[in-house]
Amino acid sequence: MQALLKAQINKTDRNDARGMAQMMRVGLYRPVHVKTQRSQKLRMLLTHRKLLQSKAIAIDNDLRGTLRNFGFKVGTVGAARFEARITELIENIPDLAVLVEPLLVVRRVLREQLGILHHRLLAIVRNDDVCRRLMTVPGVGPVVALTYRATVDVPARFRKSKAVGAVFGLTCSKYQSGEIDWSGRISRCGDEMMRACSMKQLRACCGRRNGAGSKPGRCRSPGAAG
């Protein structure tokens, strides 16, 4: 679109409107699905939850890194005992505690609000028949199910089930010219959040044992014996 408009000698609003109308007439652009209000609200819940989660993890990593400079190693602790472990390390160093305490307060608030959003997410999934059905698939949890529900939005807009993979950006790119014909990696043109959830679900399926002789981290064919 921009290349066509720049090709015009005279740049005016009338010429721009005429150029855009001509491009629409050619038929190179496809209509875009506008998500429903419910889908947009679900996406907002998922993005806000992810934002709080990433900020809380960033604070944890920052505290681990800065305390390591002073010779303190936090070690392997869960989210519930993280603050107690930090307080234990700096309780006898007042000048260091003054610098660390603000981050602990912010982390505490982030974790509290993250829990509220997560419980809200679980309540929505619990009352949604489609999400409960999706969770019967191995590796699919509440977050993946709700992300899929919000991304697909209106299933009737897909003529075939194979088209869903293209919307997620999980189909292979194609390059063909003369005798050259090869398929590249996935296009990654679709929804980034859904694609990330799909990869997590795939790793969860590959990481579990599927009967005798199966090793963790190796995917088995659905029709394989055993």
Could you tell me what each predicted segment is?
Residues M1-G226:
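A detector of single, family-specific signature residues
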